Each structure stands twice: as C-alpha cells, then as structure tokens.
C-alpha cells in the first residue's frame, strides 16, 4: 500500500511546509499594463517560557536532563525549590505590603489635606460670617441715616409746596375780590402726576426745581427728528437737557409706600418696648444674657462688636460687662452673687412650742489608752475595744444607748491619738456634753489637755470620768488636782464640773456616770422640732466596695426619711437606705440619732453640715457651687511676690525636697488624720506632699496616679484589688498596708530622715610643728614636721597657722616617715608633710589636723 493510500485512508493531509502567509497583488504599470505579484508575509515567532507543570515545562528552557526553570534557578542560587518559592512569596508579600503602605500613606495624606482644607474653609466661613454681620450692621445704620434724611427732605418739600400754594391763593384772592354775599369755598387745585407721586413717596427729577403753578417755562427750540429706537432710553443729551421728567418705577413707589407705612407704625402704632428686670450673676454667657433680656443674641453680639469686642454666643461675660449691656438695652439690672444659692439652705431656729425633748449627744474624749472605748463597751455591754487594730480607736463611732429608766443617750467615741485632732474637734462641736476620760494611774496627758481646749472652744459642758480606779497605783485625787492647772474645778473642790470615779473593767461607778449625764442633760433642756426637714452634721464618711459612698450623719433637728434629697458638703444624692449602729434598716431617723446613709454621689468631708432640699436641681446647684469653690481654693495660683523677702522665701521653698505620698483609708476621717500628721513631720529641707488622701480601696487609677507622681501608696485598713496589684507589680509601684497609724507616721519619718543631708562635724586629731622646709623637684615644697599632740593621718584636713592666724585650710597630700608613705604618725614622731595646691610654708608654722565626720540627722518629734 502506498503512502497516498495511507493518507487517504486515514483522512490526513500529506506533510508539507506551510508558508508563513501571503497573497497576490495586481501591480499596475505605465501605458495600461498590469502584473499579478505574489506577496509573502513573514511572521516572527516569539518564544515564551512554559508555565510550571505545563506540557512543555520539562522539555524547554535548555536545562540539563529535562530540569525545570524553577529548579535551575534554585540550583543556580544554591537553594532548594521550596526555599526559592518561599523567597519569591516573601518578596511578593513585601512588595504588596510596601504597595499597601504607600497607598495608606497617600490616603492619610489625602485625609490630612482634606481635614486641613475643611478647617481652613471653616475658618474662612467664620471670618466671612463675622465680616458679613459687621457689614449688615453698617448697612443697617447707613440705611437708617438715609431714610431719616429722605423723610426730612420730603417733609421740607411738602412744607414748601404748601407755602407756595397758600401764596398763590392769596394772590388770586387779591386780583379778584369776592362778592359780599358770596360764600367763600375752598378752591380745589388739580394735582398733577408728579405731585401725586411725591405724595406717595416717589421722587421726580426736574431741571427747574419743584413743580408748581408759576410763570411759564422758557420754550426750547424744536429739536430735529430723532431715531425712535432711542426713545425711552437715558442718553447723555437727555441728561444735559433735562427737560423731560424721569420718574421711579411702580415697584419703587410701592416700596416707598411700605417704608412710610412701617415708619408710621413704628412711631405711633408700634408695640412698646417692655422693660424687664434682668438677674445678672458673676459670670454669664452671651446667649443666656440675651435670653434673659428677651433679645436676639445677634443684637447683643452686634452691640459688643460696636464696643470693640468680638464675642460668640457661648462666650462668658463678667458681671460688670453684662450690667452695661443690660442698661444699654433699656432693662433693669439685678446683681446677684454665686453664694446666694446657699441662702435658705440652713433654716432659722424653730419656735419653742414646736420643739420636743430629745436625747443628749455625748462625746467621749481623752488621751490614748485611757479606756474611752472600754468605758463605752461597759455602758453598752459590748466588746468593741478588743477588735480594734493596736487597741486604739482610729475613727469616730456613734452609738445610742437606752438606760434602765428608758432614757436614750447618743455616744460619740472619738480617737485619742495625737493624729486625730480634727476628729476630736468635730466631736466637741457636734455634741451637747463631753465626758473627759482620764486614767487614774496616768493622770493628765497632752491629748487630755487638747480635749479640754476643744470642749471650751465649743462651749460644751464637761463631765470628768476618772477611769481605771480598780488598779493599785490609781490616784484619783492627783487627777483632780492636775485638772486645776487647766481651769477644770470639780464639785468636790467647790467647782461646777461633775466628776465620777469609774472602772470599765469592774463596771464600778457606771450608774453614777449615767445619773450625772441625765442631770446635765436636764439642766441643758435639750429640745428639737421633729416635724421639719432634717439638718445635722457629717460625723464620718467612707467608700464601701459593695455599697458605694457611705456617710455617718448625726441628725440635730428634724426627721430624715428614706427617699429625701440630701446635700452634705459638696456631695448630694437621694437617701436610698438608713442604717443604725446595729446594722438595722430604718424608715426614718429623728433628732439626736446617728445613722449611715447610702445614695450620695461621693464621700463628703467629715464636719460638713447636711440638710434636706426640695428638688434635685437645687441640690445639684449647691453641690456644683461648693465643688467649684473647692477647686478654686486648692488650684488657685499664688499671687506674685511683692518684695524681695517673699521672692527669696519662695525660692527657698522650691529647694525643699518633697516626698510624694498617696493615702487610701477605710474612712475619710482616717485619711484626713494621716494627711494632717504627715504634713506636720517635715522641716525647711524636706516635707511630705500628699498627692491624694481619700477613702476606699486601692484601684488602678490610684496606681497610675502614683506611677506618674513617683509616689508609694499607703493603704490604711484597705486592700488593693487584683487588677491594681498586677498593675503595681508591672509598673514598679510600691503598695504598703497599715492598720495602726503609729506605723504610718514612723515609716514616713524614717524615710524623710534618710532624705536629709547629713550633718558634718569637725573632730580635732592633732598638732604638728614645721621644723624645716625642703624643696623637692617633682613634689614641690615639703615640710619636715614633728607631731606635738595627737595623731596625724594621711588625707585628713589641715589648717596652716602662722602667729595664731589661719592662712590656709585644705587637705594633706603626702605623709611620709623617712622615704615611706605611712597612714598615720603619732605624737613625738617626725614626718614629712605636703599640702594640696599650697606651698607657702615656713619654719615655725603650726599645722592643725582634723577630720570631718557625717552624722545622720533626726526630725524633731
């Protein structure tokens, strides 16, 4: 079988070279000849690398043994295929990230440019608005002036026309005398169009002045015929000739009529301006001032612009400026002060017929460890003293005791430690009777004397309770004798002060003490009105973790009920709960009862007065005013120094080292006592600076504040939560926990003593006499000396004496015995000595040797 048969049988074409492409083109020649020309088109074949895994991937590229391009490139770089792929991916990822960063950078730049353009546009709009308002104000003023001038001119023109008409009437009447029997009737003069327009407020321009009957105007020569196209149009020739009357349009006449109507309404029939009484406080915004005057804010702003001040609606004006604005707008000014918000907060005393007897409030005061809390425990049959840290009371406790006869007494247990002076002062101010507890074995102590002074300053009667009479070394008579030095004369010594010998341990004399209290209360005739809103004093406050701000209040008069709105110091809130000393919920609290309240927005300062107000708005207003005053008092800038002494004192104060501290305590009174004690420790060189002293546990904000201030945190009877502990550990903030105030004061005192510069003391050690002076080449002058007294040590301080006069004071540079350096030379021994930076040595001079020692300083107690 032939190849042709095979091809035909398989249906395939025979193999042949395919031309790259071509065709025939008819080519024309001169004289009508043409020829068919074969055209061949050549095409270029472009070789491209085959894709990975493609059909030709293993055969192309010229790699040895069918190796792929990727493997060849990897082998060329000394990498594996996976490493090359990873590198290519990393490069692609880096390029993509770079492209993303570039796009983000362009986007940020566009946003920044857009924001800058927006700010610039807002600034330009604000400037345009201010300029537009000024321009409108100026145009309004100019328009008013023009209207006034126009109305005046119209009035003068009307008067002139009326006078000319009257003259014409008189002249015509003289020419033609009327008949005797003929009745005179007013002659009606026809009004031309120009006069009608003038009456309506229009304006007519004439060449010869005002129109009216009179001599005939001089006739103008006839003009040549003009083009009708220029008819009715204003030309230069018409302006020069001026014989044609030109009038305003009907719309202009209508506007003039409306202006005249508006003017008549403003002068005669318009509404009258109302004069108001405007209350002007110490500071007020422009919008609020305009609202109180019932004026537009734009008018007030325009007025201030005329005065040369650029203000906005929310800008604050002082009282003097606001008063001038109100007076210029025609209103009555009523000046008030910010302190007026507290008017009526504490009412006057009640009428005697409305008062009822109340329980006395007793403050137990005295020196620390004299048994005040134990005496109260004996009266209440409780045991509180054993549960207190260190066995001392560190905040005021309020309790109410019911005696056997049914009489109730409210006790306030005040701390006796020296740090709680402010608490004792509050206790004396808030009570009716002071029980002065003095230990029979310890007699009068400093805090006893302080308690006496507090009671006398408050005018509170005193009952002396001589405690611990059961001890063998007790001497009650010595106590009463020592009290005479402080003007406390008891009844046993012909005085007026009651005294009772008691023992909290054996309960001796408790009945006599209660009888003395009842007698003193009966003499005081204590009464209060329970049927009124409650008023009283804040005894203590704290921030409880579960209950929030808690304040202990002593009701002096009235009845405090649940749900009422209370303002206590700079805090306010609605009473959510009333809790007595036993932890029981009460619906209300009457006079002489101490209760804890919940619901305030913060812990008030102890010693502040509290009262019930009628609305939340008034409570918020009073609290905001007090908080603002507190911020001004603590953050106000000191006035500039007016003398050299004040400037030097301030510079000296700036050089004082400060120890920053952050104090958190269980109650506000303890924080106040710690702050007062620590601030009194320092001197002119070092002092404690309390960054914050507040009740409540240590939280994260306290740690951050301590970190920024470089201060440790002192936690008194409180703990830090978990987040605060972790943050303090990360930031390196030290948190110290205390339960006794002694330890706080001692630690701070020791730390501040370490900050003091040590005291330098000079200690004399010996004398030496110069026998001969030698000049050494490298060393300089060296004195050959004999130690006459004491000892001379190398590096000690020296003074050169000549004729008992100190010529030089410095340090000993060299001390030699023969040719050897020695550490010291004793009396009777010769040595060689050289001074630092001094060589004026002579035979016979005396050398005084001394040492400077540093002694740690102590702070005064």
UniProtKB/Swiss-Prot annotation:
Keyword Nucleotide-binding belongs to the record: yes
Region span, G5: 503-505
GO MF entry, a single one: GTPase activity
Residue ranges with Basic and acidic residues bias: 94-108, 121-155, 163-186, 255-273
Ranges for region G2: 391-395
GO CC annotations, alphabetized: cytosol
Biased composition (Low complexity): 109-120, 213-223
Alphabetically ordered keywords of this record: Cytoplasm, GTP-binding, Initiation factor, Nucleotide-binding, Protein biosynthesis
Domain of life: Bacteria
Residues given in the record as GTP binding sites: 366-373, 413-417, 467-470
Bias type Gly residues, positions: 53-65
The keyword Methyltransferase belongs to this UniProt entry's keyword annotation: no
Stretches the record annotates as G1: 366-373
Location of region: G3: 413-416
General function of this protein: One of the essential components for the initiation of protein synthesis. Protects formylmethionyl-tRNA from spontaneous hydrolysis and promotes its binding to the 30S ribosomal subunits. Also involved in the hydrolysis of GTP during the formation of the 70S ribosomal complex.
Name recorded for this polypeptide: Translation initiation factor IF-2
Organism listed in the record: Maricaulis maris (strain MCS10)
């Amino acid at each position: 079988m032939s190849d042709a048969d095979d091809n035909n049988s398989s249906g395939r074409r025979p193999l042949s070279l395919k031309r790259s492409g071509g065709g025939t083109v008819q080519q024309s020649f001169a004289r009508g000849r043409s020829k068919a020309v074969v055209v061949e088109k050549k095409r270029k074949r472009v070789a491209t690398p085959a894709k990975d895994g493609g059909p030709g991937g293993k055969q192309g590229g010229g790699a040895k043994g069918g190796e792929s391009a990727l493997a060849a490139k990897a082998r060329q770089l000394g990498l594996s295929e996976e490493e090359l792929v990873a590198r290519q991916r990393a490069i692609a990822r880096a390029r993509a990230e770079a492209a993303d960063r570039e796009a983000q950078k362009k986007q940020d730049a566009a946003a920044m440019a857009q924001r800058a353009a927006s700010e610039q546009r807002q600034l330009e709009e604000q400037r345009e608005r201010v300029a537009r308002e000024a321009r409108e104000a100026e145009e309004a003023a100019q328009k008013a002036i023009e209207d006034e001038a126009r109305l005046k001119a119209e009035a003068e023109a009307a008067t002139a026309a009326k006078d000319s008409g009257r003259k014409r009437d008189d002249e015509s009447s003289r020419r033609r005398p009327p008949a005797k029997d003929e009745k005179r009737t007013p002659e009606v003069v026809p009004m031309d169009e120009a006069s009608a327009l003038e009456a309506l407020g229009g304006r007519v321009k004439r060449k010869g002045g005002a129109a009216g009957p009179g001599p005939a105007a001089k006739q103008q020569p006839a003009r040549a015929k003009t083009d009708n196209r220029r008819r009715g149009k204003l030309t230069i020739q018409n302006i020069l000739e001026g014989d044609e009357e030109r009038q305003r349009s009907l719309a202009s006449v209508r506007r003039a009529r409306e202006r005249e109507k508006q003017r008549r309404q403003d002068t005669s029939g318009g509404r009258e301006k109302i004069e108001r009484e405007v209350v002007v406080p110490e500071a007020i915004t422009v919008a609020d001032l305009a609202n109180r005057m019932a004026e537009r804010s734009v008018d007030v702003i325009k007025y201030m612009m005329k005065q040369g001040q650029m203000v906005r609606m929310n800008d604050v004006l002082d009282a003097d400026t606001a008063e001038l604005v109100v007076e210029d707008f025609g209103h009555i000014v009523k000046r008030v002060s910010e302190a007026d918000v507290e008017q009526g907060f504490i009412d006057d005393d009640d009428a005697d017929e409305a008062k009822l007897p109340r329980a006395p409030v007793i403050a137990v005061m005295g020196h620390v460890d004299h048994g005040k809390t134990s005496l109260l425990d004996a009266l209440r049959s409780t045991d509180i003293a054993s549960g207190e840290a260190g066995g001392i009371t560190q905040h005021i406790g309020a309790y109410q005791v019911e005696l056997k006869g049914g009489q109730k007494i409210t006790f306030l247990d005040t701390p006796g430690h020296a740090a709680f002076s402010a608490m004792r002062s509050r206790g004396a101010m808030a009570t009716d009777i002071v029980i002065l507890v003095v230990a029979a074995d310890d007699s009068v102590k400093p805090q006893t004397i302080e308690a006496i002074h507090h009671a006398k300053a408050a005018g509170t009667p005193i009952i002396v309770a001589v405690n611990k009479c059961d001890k063998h070394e007790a001497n009650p008579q010595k106590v009463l004798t020592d009290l005479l030095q402080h003007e406390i004369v008891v009844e046993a010594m012909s005085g007026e002060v009651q005294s009772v010998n008691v023992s909290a341990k054996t309960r001796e004399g408790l009945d006599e003490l209660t009888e003395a209290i009842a007698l003193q209360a009966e003499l005081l005739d204590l009464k209060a009105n329970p049927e009124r809103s409650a008023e009283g004093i804040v005894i203590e406050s704290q921030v409880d973790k579960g209950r929030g701000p808690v304040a202990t209040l002593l009701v002096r008069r009235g009845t405090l009920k649940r749900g009422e709105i209370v303002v206590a110091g700079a805090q306010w809130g609605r009473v959510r709960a009333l809790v007595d000393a036993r932890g029981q919920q009460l619906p209300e609290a009457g006079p002489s009862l101490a209760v804890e309240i919940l619901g305030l927005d913060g812990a008030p300062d102890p010693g502040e007065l509290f009262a019930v107000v009628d609305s939340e708005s008034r409570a918020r207003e009073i609290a905001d005013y007090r908080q603002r005053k507190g911020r001004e008092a603590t953050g106000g800038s000191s006035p500039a120094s007016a003398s050299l002494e004040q400037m030097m004192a301030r510079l000296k104060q700036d050089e004082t080292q400060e120890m920053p501290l952050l104090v958190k305590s269980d109650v506000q009174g303890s924080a106040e006592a710690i702050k007062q004690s620590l601030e009194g420790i320092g001197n002119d060189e070092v002092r404690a600076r309390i960054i914050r002293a507040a009740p409540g546990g240590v939280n994260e904000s306290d740690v951050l504040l301590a970190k920024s201030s470089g201060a440790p945190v002192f936690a008194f009877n409180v703990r830090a939560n978990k987040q605060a502990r972790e943050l303090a550990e990360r930031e390196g903030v030290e948190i110290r926990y205390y339960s006794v105030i002694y330890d706080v004061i001692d630690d701070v005192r020791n730390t501040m003593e370490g900050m003091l510069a040590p005291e330098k003391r000079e200690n004399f050690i010996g004398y030496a006499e110069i026998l001969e002076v030698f000049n050494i080449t490298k060393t300089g002058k060296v004195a050959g000396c004999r130690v006459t007294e004491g000892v001379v040590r190398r590096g000690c301080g020296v003074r050169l004496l000549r004729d008992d006069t100190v010529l030089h004071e410095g340090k000993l540079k060299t001390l030699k015995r023969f040719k050897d350096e020695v550490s010291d030379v004793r009396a009777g021994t010769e040595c060689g000595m050289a001074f630092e930076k001094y060589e004026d040595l002579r035979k016979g001079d005396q050398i005084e040797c001394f040492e400077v020692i540093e002694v740690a300083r102590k702070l005064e107690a």
